[in-house]
Amino acid sequence: PLYSSAASDVYKRQLTAFVCDRDRILAVSGSGRRELTDRSISQPLEKLMEARKPYQSPGTPEKTLLPCEGAPRVLLCAAPVLAGGDVTGAVGLLTEDRAACPEDAQCKAVAVAAAFLAKQMEE
């Protein structure tokens, strides 16, 4: 419920949104929900979370990252969920356009959703 709500809020920006924990994609809003929900996250996404920094696609197709193996969409932007000083997951936006660069508003929406989830988990 909490994860689905956060994914829905980000999805209103007309992209596929997801929320994951450190192992699996927990919630997806937008196209690809069935393909992505409950799949194991990719190693690059895991490394992004461990870095504890937001991610923005560089807009070059050969440098795109997948949220899980074989995903039809790539990461546009993502932010780690940091609760109590620990990385508990991430929130992100996905796109089919491998050359897309995220807008500032999209990155901020993802960061706000991640901060919101972190606050909810701490309470």
Describe each model-derived feature in a short phrase.
Residues 81-91:
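Short hydrophobic/glycine-rich mini-motifs in sensory/regulatory modules
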Residues 95-108, 120-123:
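Regulatory loop-to-helix N-cap segments in sensory/regulatory domains
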Residues 22, 34-68:
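Regulatory sensory and allosteric helical modules in signal-transduction proteins
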Residues 70-80:
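A short beta-strand signature within small-molecule sensing/ligand-binding domains used
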